[in-house]
């Protein structure tokens, strides 16, 4: 093998390892499936924060997705006890994405999913960025379309449930297209 070919071979072998070690970045999608309640048993698409937060090192087969109270999660959470070791669903607005992520992290959450506060948003992903402070967050932070967040919250309210049960992350490449349970209100 020539010296140039050996160099390219090393690069090709190293690149997938580098991507796997660093996880998803902006414009990558992460998928999760709601397992319960059944009326929203769909696979949802989210995007990771651009320059803060951690990555998923574990696949959670069943974990609670707990809507934060208050929904904007800019301070103390009245249901913070339920967020410990679970994933919080919060709404955009009131404070920075990083501030919301830190509030959930301080309550022991494993990750935060921040849905757009524009409930009619069914196609535009917002780029979540650092807030120019020196603060950091270690848990994954994901952005969810406003329509998706609204539909999850609405279903929980209709059923009188304090949380949804989800599986995250979901590898959609291993699911046949006809089996993908996509929300009927969202274009893929």
From Swiss-Prot:
The keyword Glycoprotein is annotated on this UniProt entry: yes
Record PTM text: N-glycosylated; required for efficient secretion.
Tissue: Expressed in metabolically active tissues such as liver, muscle, adipose, and heart and different brain regions like cortex and hypothalamus, expression is acutely regulated by the nutritional state.
Signal peptide location: 1-21
Entry keywords, A to Z: Glycoprotein, Secreted, Signal
Primary location: secreted
Reported phenotype of the disruption mutant: Mutants born at the expected Mendelian ratio, and they appear normal with no gross developmental abnormalities. Knockout female mice fed with high fat diet have reduced weight gain by elevating physical activity and energy expenditure.
Glycosylated residues (UniProt): 121, 171
GO cellular component: extracellular region
InterPro entries, alphabetized: PA_dom_sf, PA_domain, PRADC1-like_PA
Highest taxon, organism lineage: Eukaryota
Sequence ranges assigned to domain PA in this UniProt record: 83-163
Cellular localization per UniProt: Secreted
Protein's UniProt keywords contain Glycoprotein: yes
Induction and repression of expression: Expression in metabolically active tissues is significantly suppressed by refeeding.
Cited PANTHER family: PROTEASE-ASSOCIATED DOMAIN-CONTAINING PROTEIN, PROTEASE-ASSOCIATED DOMAIN-CONTAINING PROTEIN 1
Function of the protein: Plays a role in the modulation of physical activity and adiposity.
Protein name stated in the entry: Protease-associated domain-containing protein 1
